């Protein structure tokens, strides 16, 4: 449940979402779905009233805003999804940005996991490690970000811009306040 709270606070502070929808990544949307860990996470998050928990979300919806703004997953699954997104970006880049060709190629493999969003540049920028730069570690005293060891100058610049956004949004203070109320 703590990751749901952290994600919700970050989405409010840094991304400007008024009431972010938080969900657990699972194999189905129904409450009883998933393994023991997913079911326990669901129960903990459902009981936590500090954020807007909307239930489970299937992987086919994580690249859309139809169900959730914040998706909570274990480290193995979350990192696997991150790597998949990076791979999709590299495939599209190698094809020269020929997104319709990529869509035609991937459709039989991934079904509907890649939505209409697929044509939009913002979607591809979000998959590009160079555009994002790194990942927020949710520092309580100050924003902390981790990047790849092989980060390029562009990725480092993107990381600095992300840190600037996090500092201007006063994210650490919002996080401290929420944790005091816990």
Task: Tell me what each language-model feature is.
Residues 67-71, 75-182:
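Glycine-rich phosphate/nucleotide-binding loop
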Residues 1-59, 69:
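Glycine-rich phosphate/diphosphate-binding loop of Rossmann-like nucleotide-binding domains
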Residues 56-65, 128-129:
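Glycine-rich oxoanion-binding loops at beta->alpha junctions
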């Amino acid at each position: 449940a703590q990751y749901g709270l952290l994600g919700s606070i970050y989405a409010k502070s840094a991304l400007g979402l008024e009431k972010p929808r938080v969900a657990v990544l699972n194999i189905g949307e129904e409450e009883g779905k998933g393994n023991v860990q997913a079911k326990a996470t669901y129960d903990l998050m459902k009981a936590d009233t500090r954020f807007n928990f909307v239930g489970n979300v299937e992987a086919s919806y994580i690249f859309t805003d139809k169900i959730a703004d914040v998706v909570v997953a274990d480290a193995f699954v979350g990192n696997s999804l991150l790597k998949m997104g990076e791979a999709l970006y590299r495939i599209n880049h190698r094809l020269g940005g020929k997104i319709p060709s990529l869509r035609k190629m991937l459709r039989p493999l991934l079904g509907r996991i890649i939505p209409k969003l697929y044509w939009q540049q913002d979607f591809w920028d979000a998959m590009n490690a160079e555009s994002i730069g790194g990942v927020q570690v949710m520092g309580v005293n100050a924003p902390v970000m981790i990047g790849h060891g092989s980060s390029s100058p562009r990725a480092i610049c993107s990381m600095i811009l992300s840190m600037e956004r996090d500092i201007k949004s006063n994210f650490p203070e919002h996080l401290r306040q929420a944790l005091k109320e816990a």
